Amino acid sequence: MIRDITLGQFYPGNSWVHRLDARVKIMVTLLYIVSIFVVKDFIGFALEALGLAVVIAISRVPLKFILRGLKPIFILIAFTFVINMFMIKGEVLVSFWIFSISREGLRMAIFMAIRLILLIIGSSLLTLTTKPVSLTDGMEALLSPFKRFGLPAHDLAMMMTIALRFIPTLLEETDKIMKAQMARGADFESGNILRRAKALIPILVPLFISAFRIAQDLAMAMEARCYGSNGKKTRMNGMKICSRDIVACLIFAAFLAMIILERILL
């Protein structure tokens, strides 16, 4: 399950989505996430899912690889579903003991589960189709207007990118530690949830040590390349909006307008 997390990973490719400007992809992803919380009915969610499916098809990232990222958050989705189903009051459909399931609660539970699934897939698609360097440059460019207020745009963008890239790195380290301890007789798969959680405690110390080691190696590599110097920073590849980026923006604007109209009219 640890290896199933796709957030923060990059899937190499040369598709139309891969070649889009990072700034465009970041803004489109943010607006798409906002639009997920705007829709209030099944038609809206169907449009959201259809738009995401089209982007996945164009990106040529295997659907199996993308759906694999949903496995680690299945418990969160199930927990959210159950909480919404039982906590929201309304017209009772089923009642047993002190629990009751309402029509409104079931509807909200389904909507929240769909929102989480679309949010995770949409966010993962950004990192899967954008190189880490391009992601950093895109974030810095979008944050650059705030420099006049003293915001260190470059450092903040670098921190966010490193945090994203550390997710698969730390998961890989966790997997290595678990396999090493399983080879020595550790059992992480038997017993109830509490017993499995307790079995993971011995992993924490070597994981923290490994994380500090990776962070130190990264810091030394950045210092060796004079990161943090006061000189003007340059890029090997400049960022430029081209025709395909404009077309992508127009298509997404039409999609967003359709979502808003559906929300208003239906």
Locate the predicted segments by residue:
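Transmembrane alpha-helix interface motif
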Residues: M1-G44, E48-A57, A141-L151, D155-M158, ...
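Alpha-helical transmembrane segments and their membrane-interface exit regions
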Residues: G51-V61, L76-F79
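Juxtamembrane/interface alpha-helical elements of multi-pass membrane proteins
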Residues: I73-A186
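Transmembrane helix-loop junctions in multipass membrane proteins, especially transporters and channels
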Residues: D41, F45, R60-K64, I88-F96, ...
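Membrane-helix interfacial "entry" motifs
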Residues: N14, F37, R60-F65, F96, ...
